[in-house]
Amino acid sequence: GGEAPLASSDAVRAAVRDLLRHGGFKPTGRSKPASEYLIRASAEGALGSINAAVDVCNAVSLHGGLPISVIDLDRATPPFAIAIAKEGTSYVFNASGQTLDVGGLVALFDAEGPCANAVKDAQRTKTSPGSTRTLTVIWGTSRLEGRTRESFAWYRRLLEALGARVSESATR
Protein backbone atom coordinates (compact mmCIF):
# COMPACT_ATOMS: atom_id res chain seq x y z
CA GLY A 1 0.00 0.00 0.00
CA GLY A 2 0.93 3.57 0.52
CA GLU A 3 0.93 6.57 -1.72
CA ALA A 4 2.85 6.67 -4.99
CA PRO A 5 5.94 8.92 -4.64
CA LEU A 6 5.60 10.12 -8.25
CA ALA A 7 2.73 11.51 -10.31
CA SER A 8 2.54 11.95 -14.06
CA SER A 9 1.48 15.23 -15.66
CA ASP A 10 0.97 16.87 -19.03
CA ALA A 11 4.57 18.16 -18.82
CA VAL A 12 5.88 14.61 -18.31
CA ARG A 13 3.79 13.29 -21.23
CA ALA A 14 5.04 16.11 -23.50
CA ALA A 15 8.69 15.49 -22.57
CA VAL A 16 8.33 11.74 -23.22
CA ARG A 17 6.73 12.36 -26.63
CA ASP A 18 9.58 14.75 -27.48
CA LEU A 19 12.06 12.01 -26.52
CA LEU A 20 10.36 9.65 -28.96
CA ARG A 21 10.52 12.31 -31.71
CA HIS A 22 14.29 12.78 -31.15
CA GLY A 23 15.26 10.52 -34.08
CA GLY A 24 12.26 11.30 -36.27
CA PHE A 25 9.70 8.83 -34.87
CA LYS A 26 6.07 9.99 -34.76
CA PRO A 27 4.37 8.98 -31.46
CA THR A 28 0.76 8.94 -32.67
CA GLY A 29 -2.08 6.46 -32.93
CA ARG A 30 -0.98 2.97 -31.87
CA SER A 31 2.62 4.21 -31.55
CA LYS A 32 2.07 6.25 -28.39
CA PRO A 33 4.40 5.86 -25.40
CA ALA A 34 3.71 2.73 -23.34
CA SER A 35 3.15 4.92 -20.27
CA GLU A 36 0.11 6.46 -22.00
CA TYR A 37 -1.25 3.01 -22.86
CA LEU A 38 -1.01 2.07 -19.17
CA ILE A 39 -3.26 4.98 -18.17
CA ARG A 40 -6.03 3.71 -20.45
CA ALA A 41 -5.51 0.03 -19.60
CA SER A 42 -5.60 0.80 -15.88
CA ALA A 43 -8.79 2.86 -16.21
CA GLU A 44 -10.41 -0.04 -18.11
CA GLY A 45 -9.23 -2.60 -15.53
CA ALA A 46 -7.22 -4.36 -18.25
CA LEU A 47 -3.86 -4.61 -16.45
CA GLY A 48 -3.27 -8.21 -15.45
CA SER A 49 -0.36 -9.63 -13.51
CA ILE A 50 2.59 -10.98 -15.56
CA ASN A 51 5.51 -11.27 -13.14
CA ALA A 52 7.05 -9.14 -10.38
CA ALA A 53 9.38 -7.18 -12.68
CA VAL A 54 6.64 -6.25 -15.16
CA ASP A 55 3.97 -5.64 -12.52
CA VAL A 56 6.27 -3.26 -10.62
CA CYS A 57 7.35 -1.65 -13.91
CA ASN A 58 3.70 -1.00 -14.78
CA ALA A 59 3.00 0.61 -11.39
CA VAL A 60 6.06 2.88 -11.57
CA SER A 61 5.42 3.82 -15.20
CA LEU A 62 1.71 4.45 -14.63
CA HIS A 63 2.34 6.82 -11.71
CA GLY A 64 5.68 8.32 -12.81
CA GLY A 65 4.83 8.80 -16.47
CA LEU A 66 8.06 7.41 -17.94
CA PRO A 67 7.84 4.41 -20.26
CA ILE A 68 9.73 1.36 -18.97
CA SER A 69 10.89 -1.71 -20.89
CA VAL A 70 11.52 -5.08 -19.24
CA ILE A 71 13.15 -7.84 -21.29
CA ASP A 72 14.00 -11.43 -20.41
CA LEU A 73 17.80 -11.77 -20.32
CA ASP A 74 17.49 -15.48 -21.10
CA ARG A 75 15.74 -14.63 -24.38
CA ALA A 76 18.09 -11.79 -25.43
CA THR A 77 21.62 -11.97 -26.83
CA PRO A 78 24.31 -9.56 -25.54
CA PRO A 79 25.88 -7.15 -26.18
CA PHE A 80 23.28 -4.45 -25.53
CA ALA A 81 23.24 -0.88 -26.82
CA ILE A 82 20.81 2.02 -26.95
CA ALA A 83 20.61 3.77 -30.32
CA ILE A 84 18.17 5.22 -32.84
CA ALA A 85 16.73 2.52 -35.10
CA LYS A 86 17.35 3.01 -38.82
CA GLU A 87 14.44 3.81 -41.12
CA GLY A 88 12.59 0.71 -42.25
CA THR A 89 13.46 -1.26 -39.10
CA SER A 90 10.60 -3.19 -37.53
CA TYR A 91 9.89 -6.12 -35.25
CA VAL A 92 7.07 -8.34 -34.05
CA PHE A 93 5.70 -7.02 -30.76
CA ASN A 94 2.97 -9.49 -29.84
CA ALA A 95 2.02 -13.16 -30.07
CA SER A 96 -0.34 -12.38 -32.98
CA GLY A 97 2.65 -11.41 -35.13
CA GLN A 98 1.85 -7.70 -35.43
CA THR A 99 4.85 -5.54 -36.30
CA LEU A 100 5.94 -2.09 -35.18
CA ASP A 101 8.02 0.16 -37.44
CA VAL A 102 10.69 1.48 -35.06
CA GLY A 103 12.62 3.56 -37.59
CA GLY A 104 13.71 6.83 -35.95
CA LEU A 105 12.90 5.57 -32.44
CA VAL A 106 15.42 5.36 -29.61
CA ALA A 107 15.61 1.64 -28.88
CA LEU A 108 17.43 -1.03 -26.93
CA PHE A 109 19.36 -3.37 -29.24
CA ASP A 110 20.78 -6.79 -28.53
CA ALA A 111 23.01 -8.76 -30.92
CA GLU A 112 19.95 -9.65 -33.05
CA GLY A 113 18.62 -6.10 -33.46
CA PRO A 114 16.16 -3.81 -31.70
CA CYS A 115 14.28 -5.51 -28.87
CA ALA A 116 12.69 -2.77 -26.77
CA ASN A 117 11.69 0.88 -26.82
CA ALA A 118 9.36 3.34 -25.11
CA VAL A 119 6.37 2.22 -27.22
CA LYS A 120 6.32 -1.59 -27.40
CA ASP A 121 8.91 -4.26 -26.66
CA ALA A 122 9.76 -7.06 -29.10
CA GLN A 123 7.93 -10.35 -28.68
CA ARG A 124 11.20 -12.30 -28.94
CA THR A 125 12.57 -10.84 -25.68
CA LYS A 126 9.36 -10.37 -23.68
CA THR A 127 9.18 -11.76 -20.18
CA SER A 128 6.84 -14.51 -19.08
CA PRO A 129 5.55 -15.66 -15.69
CA GLY A 130 8.67 -17.88 -15.46
CA SER A 131 11.24 -15.14 -16.16
CA THR A 132 13.90 -14.86 -13.45
CA ARG A 133 16.54 -12.59 -15.03
CA THR A 134 15.44 -9.31 -16.56
CA LEU A 135 16.90 -6.12 -17.95
CA THR A 136 14.91 -2.95 -17.34
CA VAL A 137 15.24 0.31 -19.25
CA ILE A 138 13.55 3.43 -17.90
CA TRP A 139 13.12 5.74 -20.87
CA GLY A 140 13.98 9.03 -19.15
CA THR A 141 14.73 12.42 -20.59
CA SER A 142 17.08 15.22 -19.51
CA ARG A 143 14.08 17.60 -19.65
CA LEU A 144 12.76 15.93 -16.49
CA GLU A 145 15.71 16.40 -14.14
CA GLY A 146 15.86 13.65 -11.53
CA ARG A 147 12.68 11.81 -12.61
CA THR A 148 14.51 8.81 -14.07
CA ARG A 149 16.58 8.47 -10.89
CA GLU A 150 13.45 8.78 -8.71
CA SER A 151 11.60 6.23 -10.85
CA PHE A 152 14.48 3.75 -10.60
CA ALA A 153 14.77 4.23 -6.83
CA TRP A 154 11.07 3.47 -6.40
CA TYR A 155 11.25 0.52 -8.83
CA ARG A 156 14.22 -0.87 -6.91
CA ARG A 157 12.54 -0.45 -3.50
CA LEU A 158 9.41 -2.27 -4.67
CA LEU A 159 11.34 -5.16 -6.25
CA GLU A 160 13.67 -5.57 -3.28
CA ALA A 161 10.63 -5.65 -0.97
CA LEU A 162 9.52 -8.67 -3.04
CA GLY A 163 12.92 -10.34 -2.57
CA ALA A 164 14.46 -9.49 -5.95
CA ARG A 165 18.13 -8.66 -6.41
CA VAL A 166 18.57 -5.41 -8.37
CA SER A 167 21.70 -3.78 -9.82
CA GLU A 168 22.05 -0.50 -11.68
CA SER A 169 23.87 0.49 -14.85
CA ALA A 170 23.30 4.08 -15.94
CA THR A 171 23.62 5.19 -19.56
CA ARG A 172 23.19 8.51 -21.35
Question: Where do the PLM segments sit?
Answer:
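Non-transmembrane, aqueous-exposed alpha-helical and coiled segments at domain scale
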Residues: 1-172
